[in-house]
Amino acid sequence: MKRLAALSLVVAFAACGGGEPAREAATDTTAAPVAAATPAAPAMGEMAMTDWFHADDAAKTIHMTITAGLTDAKNHWNFNGGHDGNMTITVPEGYAVTIDLVNKDPAMAHSLGISAVTGNFGIVDPTPAFEGAITSNPASMTDATMPGETERIQFTTGAAGSYSMVCFIPGHAAAGMWVHFNVSADGTKGVQTAM
């Protein structure tokens, strides 16, 4: 009698399927992807030369000091206070660029790279847009630029266009640790903020 009751329950539960064909239910085992943050339009404040951005037009060079965790904005996940695309750095095409990344975040490793990806920062492949435009071990939480460390990168800008400066530590760009990085064909240079 107990066996008959148990068998009846099994048959009853099996009959209560969701009405989907078995084939569809079996093949649809992946969850829908989580939408990543969509970048805002480039910051449109006045173009300025800041104390951390220096240009030498005769030598066609730019030197920047970019500080990760300069402020506590975004839990220190920012570049000179910029995050979520609220800052645009513009550099002329063909200039030699030196960036000193200073990590002032008290607890977290960060990296810096110039990426051709300008939106949907779910998972950003740590591939630089220009040769040399990336810090070492960019996706490592233990070997990237650690708190209190400074790392220098040097590269020459390529084709004019829209790029981004991102932290390649997994999840950092998706959480907002990115700013716009433009390469200008007309020699325009400087920093714009919406902060």
Language-model segments: residues:
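Bacterial signal peptide processing site
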Residues: C16-E20
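Histidine- and aromatic-enriched segments that form or immediately flank copper-ligand environments
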Residues: H76-N78, K104-P147, A173-G176, H180
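A eukaryote-biased signal for short, well-structured alpha-helical docking elements
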Residues: A40-T71
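Extracellular/periplasmic metallocenter environments
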Residues: A41-E46, D51, S136-M195
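N-terminal edge beta-strand
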Residues: A59-A96
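Sec-dependent bacterial lipoprotein signal peptides
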Residues: M1-A14
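Beta-strand cores of secreted/periplasmic/IMS beta-sandwich domains, seen most often
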Residues: D51-A55, G85-G113, E151-A159, Y163-M165
